[in-house]
Design a protein with these regions (language model features):
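Non-catalytic alpha-helical scaffolds and adjoining flexible linkers that form interface surfaces
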Residues: 1-202
Length: 202
C-alpha cells in the first residue's frame, strides 16, 4: 500500500531508493527517493515503451523469491532500461540481449557453439529448446530447429555484449533470433511473457 504523495515516483520504469514498513500481509511505502525515471524518457515511443514493459515483466519473473537479493538481475534490468532510454541500440536487440543474459544469470544460458549434450565443438546446425541450445546431429531431438549460423552468431554477440558485431547483423537473422529467444524463454519459465505480445519488432 502506498500514499498518493509517492505516486509519481512509483511509476513503471522508475529507478528509486525505497523504504518499506514490513506488515503481516502487505508492506507499506514510507519513503521514496527518485534516482532516475527511465519511463519518462520512453512514454512517447510506443515501441520502446512496450519493450521496457517486457523487460520489467521479465525482471519480476526472474526475481520471484521475495526478500532475496538479486543484484545481478537488478544491474541487468537497470542497464537495459538505461540503454533503451538513451536509444543506444536497436530496441528489440536490447530486449533480446537482456533476456539472454537474464537466462544466463538464472543458470539457463543456451549453448550457442558447442553441443549442449556431448560438448562436441561447433558451431552446429541444430538448436533445441529441450536440449539447451545448440546440438550436434547425433544428439539432436526430433523437434530441433535449424537456424542460420548467422542467427546463432548474433545471439552469441548479444549475450557477450559484442554490440559492434551485433549491429552488423541482417534483419532476417534478428527476427529469427527474436523467435528462438522468446521460445527458449517460454520453455524455461514454463509460460511466456504477456507483454511480449505487444512488442513491435523491427
Amino acid at each position: 500500500r502506498t500514499k498518493s504523495k509517492f505516486g509519481a515516483r512509483l511509476e513503471p520504469g522508475s529507478h528509486i531508493d525505497i523504504q518499506l514498513y514490513t506488515g503481516r500481509t502487505f508492506d507499506t511505502v514510507t519513503q521514496v527517493e527518485s534516482i532516475f525515471n527511465y519511463g519518462e524518457a520512453l512514454t512517447d515511443d510506443y515501441s520502446r515503451w512496450t519493450i521496457a514493459g517486457a523487460i520489467l515483466e521479465a525482471a519480476e519473473r526472474f526475481t520471484s523469491h521475495e526478500h532475496e537479493p538479486a543484484l545481478q538481475e537488478f544491474k541487468l534490468a537497470t542497464g537495459a532500461m538505461k540503454a533503451l532510454a538513451e536509444n543506444r541500440y536497436e530496441p528489440s536487440m536490447i530486449l533480446d540481449a537482456y533476456l539472454l543474459r537474464s537466462l544466463a544469470v538464472g543458470g539457463y544460458a543456451p549453448s550457442l557453439t558447442n553441443c549442449s549434450k556431448c560438448d562436441a565443438p561447433g558451431p552446429h546446425r541444430y538448436f533445441s529448446l529441450v536440449g539447451g541450445g545448440s546440438v550436434c546431429a547425433d544428439c539432436r531431438p526430433s523437434a530441433s530447429a535449424t537456424p542460420a549460423p548467422e542467427t546463432l552468431k548474433l545471439m552469441s554477440d548479444l549475450i557477450s555484449g559484442n554490440w559492434e558485431s551485433a549491429m552488423e547483423s541482417e534483419l532476417r537473422n534478428r527476427r529469427e533470433a527474436n523467435g528462438l529467444i522468446a521460445a527458449y524463454l517460454q520453455w524455461h519459465l514454463e509460460r511466456g511473457l504477456r507483454s511480449l505480445q505487444l512488442v513491435e519488432r523491427a
